[in-house]
């Protein structure tokens, strides 16, 4: 990993009170595994947890602050420290599952009153406690490993502890609390105190820091031979495939059926089997050699759908027993009418350079066949799996893919090293429903003119070097200015579309410059050079690193002991009221 990547990573870990815009911009940067230091979740209030009123009864406060709750390795955690992990674990879970959390449990009811497992009687409070225990083992196993290895926090990481205290004071005042301890209590409950919270944060930070350092160092040890060995006999897993596809559901071929009082149509097994047979026949008729081009296959699909449409009309007329008096007005249709009618028919989907892991599983074996050649076409069944009353697995045909192979690539091409100067759009209005900021043509034009002016001044100066561009970026870019706008080892799909397409244009070469527009603004681009790392090696290395880190981390976790001494002070009456 480059020095610039490491610096960006440190910024991501340590930047306190990070704004939503900053977070969105940093999604473009490469990241190692992120151990979420959930203080940030709390600080920006991503998830609202209504915990009721925390009574500050002196006895209860003392008990929570000093009761021995957990022993993990050689560490004794007090009840309040357990609560820090507990509340943050819940916050993370709710934040991660916010789109469907209200379908998982009642967010307006205490978690301790909601059974999550009818067989064991476990509640959601029990489940969250189990998740918390896992997080504690994870954190302390890494922390102990860090201490044993002599790992220390970087200067920036050390500064984040001071920044944390400052921000806690700011938020305490902002939300009307008399002091920082009162603010922490409103989040974590009785016994919360700045000293114990800072200890919790520092241990979590140390665990994160060491994980990332170990990961970086391990990745540096990988050789090309090690990567080829890791690929083993499955090199296709890192290839990408270009193909056309068309999916047909069995529902299109169902006929007959009986409509119930609720309006739903049910089919006999004979009718369902007839539909499956018709689907199979239609798919096989589409998947013939003469249909292996886009136009030919689209025409065949249209003809099939017209046939199905006519059959449906005939069936409906038979059921209604009424005479169809509709006049054929085909000759009266204008060209626009005909074009509009064409839109109602299905067409093939063109899929370009799709990674093997993103292919529909039923297509993978056929597409990866090394004997596959351009224009090959086939029909591939899609089945659902269920269990019958005797416990036997039953497969049922639900659809068919018609697939046309076009090409594949082993992704053995270089990643990109690029510098850029971002001239962002200014102004704009935020859509209240989507949260997306939109800019007027005038606002976009202003950014474009500013970028073009700066670009022209640089070119007119006549020193068109990387160094001169880097200096210009340091003075003018609104992104990564400290590093002269440098991004190294960019892989396809990492950056926004127009930025990505410029970087990976087949004609791109060192020294190329230009301006591209993205949703962020206008980027003045300077192509530094091809990276020494190929996209393929980047993917293989990432996959190997993930597996190696999981193995290493599991070993640490398995080696550390944990005893639940007294966990009764967790808040089982917590209400997750996220406003969904």
Regions found by a protein language model. Name each.
Residues 281-364, 450-498, 528:
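Peptidyl-prolyl cis-trans isomerase
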Residues 9-41, 45-65, 183-277, 281-284, ...:
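PPIase-associated folding chaperone regions across multiple families
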Residues 6-12, 131, 136, 141, ...:
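An exposure/low-complexity boundary signal
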Residues 59-195, 267:
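N-terminal targeting/tethering segments
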Residues 86, 93, 136, 140, ...:
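Sec/Tat-exported extracytoplasmic proteins
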Residues 156-158, 483-484, 570:
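Residue-level detector of family-conserved "landmark" positions at structurally sensitive sites
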Residues 91-103, 250-261, 312-321, 426-432:
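Internal, charge-rich low-complexity segments
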């Amino acid at each position: 990993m480059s020095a610039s990547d490491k610096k960006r990573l440190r910024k991501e870990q340590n930047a306190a009170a990070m704004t939503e815009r900053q977070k969105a911009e940093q999604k473009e940067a490469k990241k190692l595994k992120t151990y979420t230091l959930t203080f940030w979740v709390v600080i920006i209030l991503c998830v609202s947890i209504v915990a009721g009123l925390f009574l500050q009864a002196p006895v209860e406060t003392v008990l929570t602050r000093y009761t021995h709750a957990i022993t993990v390795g050689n560490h004794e955690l007090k009840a309040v420290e357990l609560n820090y992990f507990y509340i943050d674990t819940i916050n993370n879970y709710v934040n991660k599952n916010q789109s469907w959390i209200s379908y998982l449990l009642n967010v307006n009811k205490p978690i301790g009153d909601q059974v999550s497992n009818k067989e064991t009687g476990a509640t959601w409070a029990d489940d969250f406690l189990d998740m918390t225990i896992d997080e504690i083992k994870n954190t302390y196993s890494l922390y102990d490993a860090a201490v044993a290895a002599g790992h220390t926090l970087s200067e920036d990481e050390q500064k984040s502890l001071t920044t944390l205290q400052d921000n806690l004071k700011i938020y305490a005042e902002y939300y009307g609390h008399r002091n920082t301890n009162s603010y922490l209590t409103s989040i974590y409950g009785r016994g919360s105190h700045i000293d114990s919270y800072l200890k919790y944060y520092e241990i979590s930070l140390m665990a994160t820091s060491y994980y990332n350092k170990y990961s970086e160092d391990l990745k540096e040890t990988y050789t090309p031979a090690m990567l080829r060995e890791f690929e083993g006999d499955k090199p296709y897993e890192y290839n990408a495939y270009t193909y056309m596809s068309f999916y047909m559901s069995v529902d299109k071929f169902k006929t007959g059926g009986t409509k119930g009082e609720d309006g739903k149509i049910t089919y006999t097994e004979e009718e369902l089997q007839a539909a499956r047979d018709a689907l199979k026949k239609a798919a096989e008729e589409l998947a013939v050699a003469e249909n292996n081009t886009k136009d030919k296959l689209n025409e065949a699909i249209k003809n099939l759908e017209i046939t199905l449409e006519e059959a449906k009309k005939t069936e409906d007329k038979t059921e209604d027993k009424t005479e169809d008096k509709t006049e054929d007005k085909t000759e009266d249709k204008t060209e626009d009418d005909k074009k509009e009618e064409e839109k109602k028919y299905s067409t093939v989907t063109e899929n370009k350079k799709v990674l093997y892991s993103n292919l529909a599983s039923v297509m993978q074996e056929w597409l990866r066949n090394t004997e596959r050649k351009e224009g090959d076409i086939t029909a591939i069944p899609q089945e659902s799996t269920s269990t019958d009353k005797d416990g036997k697995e039953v497969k049922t045909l639900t659809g068919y893919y018609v697939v046309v192979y076009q090409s594949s690539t082993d992704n053995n091409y270089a990643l990109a090293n690029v510098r850029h100067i971002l001239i962002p759009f200014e102004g704009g209005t935020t859509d209240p429903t989507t949260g997306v900021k939109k800019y007027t043509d005038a606002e976009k034009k202003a950014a474009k003119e500013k970028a073009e002016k700066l670009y022209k001044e640089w070119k007119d100066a006549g020193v068109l070097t990387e160094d001169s561009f880097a200096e210009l970026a340091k003075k003018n870019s609104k992104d990564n200015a400290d590093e002269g706008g440098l991004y190294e080892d960019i892989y396809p799909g990492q950056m926004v579309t127009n930025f990505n397409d410029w970087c990976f244009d087949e004609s791109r070469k060192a020294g190329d410059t230009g301006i591209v527009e993205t949703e962020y603004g206008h980027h003045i681009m300077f192509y530094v050079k091809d990276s020494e790392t190929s996209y393929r090696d980047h993917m293989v290395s990432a996959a190997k690193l993930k597996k190696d880190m999981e193995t290493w981390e599991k070993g640490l976790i398995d080696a550390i002991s944990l005893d639940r001494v007294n966990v009764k002070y967790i808040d089982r009456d917590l209400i997750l009221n996220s406003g969904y």
